[in-house]
Amino acid sequence: MALLKKINTQVNRIMKNSSLVQNICFDRVPLFIPRLSLTVKYCLAVKLLIYLLYCWYIYSEVPSASSKFRSFTFGCVVVYHNKFFPRFIRTHSINSIRTFSKFQVIILFSIEKVTRSESKNHSYSKTDISDLHQGYNNPPSRFISQ
């Protein structure tokens, strides 16, 4: 975990020096920016990987969560690729995540929600699963890309 924190710190430093970050507040970046530099894209990819490794670290403590985590991880990767590399996945329905910041919040909220649920009763409830996916299964129509 210490290594992940060091990598995350370096990535944050690179992103702070980027002209994109200087000119645009990151929580207001639109879904698709053609001029988004490759450096920023790769930094965001590394940050996503860090969060997924963190998810894996937490879920590995809970045996019953492994299959749910695999599908959740795949969903995260699809959302990420659809947001920053839309030429790969143009028609996927998961277009609703408008910003990387919101995406991070969804991941962290999901980790907390499932971990709390597992520690209480060691099983999933339908409510917890629907909470995990409500961010991109029921998108506000104004957030869906054209």
Swiss-Prot record:
UniProt entry tagged with the keyword Secreted: no
Subcellular location: Cytoplasm; Nucleus membrane
Recorded superkingdom: Eukaryota
Alphabetical UniProt keywords: Cytoplasm, Membrane, Nucleus, Transmembrane, Transmembrane helix
GTP-binding found in the keyword field: no
GO cellular component: cytoplasm; nuclear membrane
Transmembrane segments: 38-60
Major localisation: cytoplasm
Membrane-protein topology: Single-pass membrane protein
Membership in a protein family: Belongs to the UPF0742 family.
Protein name listed in UniProt: UPF0742 protein C1348.03
Organism from which the protein derives: Schizosaccharomyces pombe (strain 972 / ATCC 24843) (Fission yeast)
